[in-house]
């Protein structure tokens, strides 16, 4: 937290860079040619819409958007209400159940309530072709999200970065560990969760860090919008 700058303030120049314009152009051309791209165009930048720069308390780095029908909506690890909870998110819920008193596993995987509390759910690549994992990995999104991480590192103070898996850990190598809290573990995927994601206690450590700084902890129980009104 601690900056009055907005995403628009710090990203306006980046969004005019040729590589970024080319990324948007390529995605738009693929959509126009009839290729199904996830998430829908209106949702591509939802991570920034739901969590303003000055509100960022926690960053959870994902990699690729989900590439199945109706899943991706612009927030890493999250899926729309009514969509089956993906395996990695299910393992995140298992870790929460094991470590956060009173947490009960939700029946949905919609994490907007995390985002609105200051948890930036950032995929490092923001689009994907239907059914083709990593199909947009080389389009330029990685350059853009590297810049996003650098800007959070520069302009915010005391942010918790949850870096799960080698991809996220490489991406987060630039973070100033004197000013921010960096927590590393294997990815929550079923392939690696048992190698140290389970038992990492990251959700508890995150809230302890925030409490030590006098900030409100994250309520990790995901709430659907209608339930929170």
From Swiss-Prot:
Recorded catalytic activity of this chain's protein: Hydrolyzes single-stranded DNA or mismatched double-stranded DNA and polynucleotides, releasing free uracil
Record InterPro entries: UDG_fam1 (IPR002043), Ura-DNA_Glyclase_AS (IPR018085), Uracil-DNA_glycosylase-like (IPR005122), Uracil-DNA_glycosylase-like_sf (IPR036895)
Record: active site: 64 (proton acceptor)
GO cellular component: cytoplasm
Main subcellular location of this protein, as a coarse class: cytoplasm
UniProt GO MF annotations: uracil DNA N-glycosylase activity
Alphabetical UniProt keywords: Cytoplasm, DNA damage, DNA repair, Hydrolase
Pfam families to which the protein is assigned, alphabetical: UDG (PF03167)
A GO biological-process term: base-excision repair, AP site formation via deaminated base removal
EC number, UniProt record: 3.2.2.27
Intracellular or extracellular location(s): Cytoplasm
Classification via NCBIfam families: PRK05254.1-1 (NF003588), PRK05254.1-2 (NF003589), PRK05254.1-4 (NF003591), PRK05254.1-5 (NF003592), ung (TIGR00628)
Cited function: Excises uracil residues from the DNA which can arise as a result of misincorporation of dUMP residues by DNA polymerase or due to deamination of cytosine.
Similarity-based family: Belongs to the uracil-DNA glycosylase (UDG) superfamily. UNG family.
Protein's name in the database: Uracil-DNA glycosylase
Gene this chain is encoded by: ung
């Amino acid at each position: 937290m601690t900056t009055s700058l907005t995403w628009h303030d710090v990203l306006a120049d980046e969004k005019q860079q040729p590589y970024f314009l080319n990324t948007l152009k390529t995605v738009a051309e693929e959509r126009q040619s009839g290729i199904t791209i996830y998430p829908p165009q209106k949702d591509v930048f939802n991570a920034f819409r739901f969590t303003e720069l000055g509100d960022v308390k926690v960053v959870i780095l994902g990699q690729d958007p989900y590439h199945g029908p109706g899943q991706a909506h612009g927030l890493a690890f999250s899926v729309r209400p009514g969509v089956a909870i993906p395996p990695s998110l299910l393992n995140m819920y298992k870790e929460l159940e094991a470590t956060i008193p009173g947490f009960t596993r939700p029946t949905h995987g919609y994490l907007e309530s995390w985002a609105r509390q200051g948890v930036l759910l950032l995929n490092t690549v923001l689009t994907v072709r239907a059914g083709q994992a990593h199909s947009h990995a080389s389009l330029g999104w990685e350059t853009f999200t590297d810049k996003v991480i650098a800007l959070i590192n520069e302009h915010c103070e005391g942010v918790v970065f949850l870096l799960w898996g080698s991809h996220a850990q490489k991406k987060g190598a630039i973070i100033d560990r004197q000013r921010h809290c960096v927590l590393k573990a294997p990815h929550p995927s079923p392939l690696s969760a048992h190698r140290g994601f389970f038992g990492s206690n990251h959700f508890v450590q995150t809230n302890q860090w925030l409490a030590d700084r006098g900030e409100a902890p994250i309520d990790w129980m995901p709430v659907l919008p209608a339930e929170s009104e």
